[in-house]
Regions:
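N-terminal interaction/assembly modules
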Residues: 1-78, 130
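Short amphipathic alpha helix immediately N-terminal
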Residues: 81-97
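N-terminal functional module detector in eukaryotic proteins
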Residues: 88, 128-130
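Short, conserved sequence motifs enriched in acidic/basic residues, glycine, and aromatics
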Residues: 79-80, 107
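Short alpha-helical "recognition helix" segments of helix-turn-helix
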Residues: 102-106
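DNA major-groove recognition helices of helix-turn-helix
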Residues: 109, 113-127
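N-terminal positioning helix adjacent to the helix-turn-helix/winged-helix DNA-binding module
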Residues: 68-72, 81-85, 116
């Protein structure tokens, strides 16, 4: 893979993590709804297990992203001799990552129930765009 392909591939992790986090929020909402409806414990346990598996997948994605990021950084250091270009590429990667972290913190502090509403999604989008 060339540099641009590696950078583009690395950006895919952001979307994979976002999709997995959304799936976890949906599954947790289902578990809470089942709790409120006083459904059988066996069903609750199965749903809780599904949430734990989804969280495990998220951790696996994050570990793979970290490994890929380290490989990308060493690749950039090895093949790009110009410090300015390497700085710009790394800075772009860091900005992408920090924007995602800020939006995640806002969504967590705002609460996932509000996040599921359109108003919550617009709020996070505004922060990311600015």
């Amino acid at each position: 893979m060339d540099i641009l392909e590696r950078l583009e591939h690395f950006k895919d992790y952001k979307y994979m993590k976002r999709n997995q986090e959304e799936e976890i929020r949906k599954q947790e909402a289902i578990v809470h709804a089942c709790d409120a409806m006083h459904l059988p414990d066996s069903l609750k346990n199965q749903l809780f297990q599904d949430v734990q598996e989804a969280k495990g997948k998220l951790i696996a994605i994050e570990l793979e992203e970290q490994r890929e990021g380290q490989e990308l950084e060493s690749f950039l250091n090895e093949y790009i001799q110009d410090d300015r270009i390497r700085y710009i590429l790394c800075r772009h990667y860091i900005q992408q990552k920090s924007l995602l972290e800020v939006s995640k913190k806002i969504s967590l502090s705002y609460g996932y129930t509000k996040m599921l509403s359109s108003k919550g999604k617009q709020m996070v989008k505004k922060v990311v765009i600015e």
